[in-house]
A protein has these predicted regions:
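Short beta-strand scaffold segments in enzyme catalytic cores
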Residues: 4-9
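Short, flexible N-terminal segments of the mature chain
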Residues: 16-68
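Low-complexity intrinsically disordered segments
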Residues: 53-161
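Short acidic-glycine loop/turn motifs at beta-strand connectors
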Residues: 10-15, 31, 100-103
Length: 161
């Protein structure tokens, strides 16, 4: 079974006047999202939450530019079960992650559980890593994209047989 997830990139200004701020249901902000990127596998916070946190840390130099960040996110996270949607409610998924942009020195990520209609977390990348990181083979975004790391793993497997 797959834990489906969607990642949105939204400027933090769209949360400032809402009573729940970054903890609100992100489907209400779909008109303000720079991207709605669906990933079919491993959407739980211990994987995708940490992946996004690691990715933000590796790309801190572009965190102030929402559109550039959204484009690079798709490039770096792409694999064969990655799709883009106009609206987040067009695809069934459990977790919606929002990367809140606008201040490169104060980045936040929220995780909303669509199945239970509740916010799981609103944390900085460092706090996500501290809380959720496990002994898993996360992508090293300083050196690879998700796809290039997978290709390198396949090449290694082929060469060992």
């Amino acid at each position: 079974m797959s834990t489906r997830n969607l990642t949105m990139v939204i400027h933090r200004d769209y949360a400032q006047n809402h009573e729940l701020g970054f903890a609100q249901n992100p489907t209400y902000l779909d008109d303000n999202s720079f991207v709605n990127m669906y990933l079919h596998h491993d959407g739980y916070p211990e994987w995708q939450g940490v992946q996004l946190a690691n990715w933000i840390k590796a790309n801190n130099d572009i965190c102030g530019d929402s559109s550039r960040l959204a484009a690079k996110l798709v490039h770096d996270m792409y694999y064969d079960s990655c799709y883009l949607y106009c609206k987040p409610d067009e695809i069934d998924h459990q977790y919606t992650y929002v990367i809140w942009t606008g201040q490169a020195d104060d980045m936040w990520i929220s995780c909303y559980d669509q199945y239970n209609s509740q916010c799981i977390f609103v944390l900085t990348p460092n706090k996500i890593i501290k809380k959720y990181k496990k002994d898993m083979d996360y992508t090293d975004f300083e050196k690879h994209t998700k796809l290039t790391q997978r290709l390198k793993e396949l090449e290694r497997l082929i060469n060992t047989n």
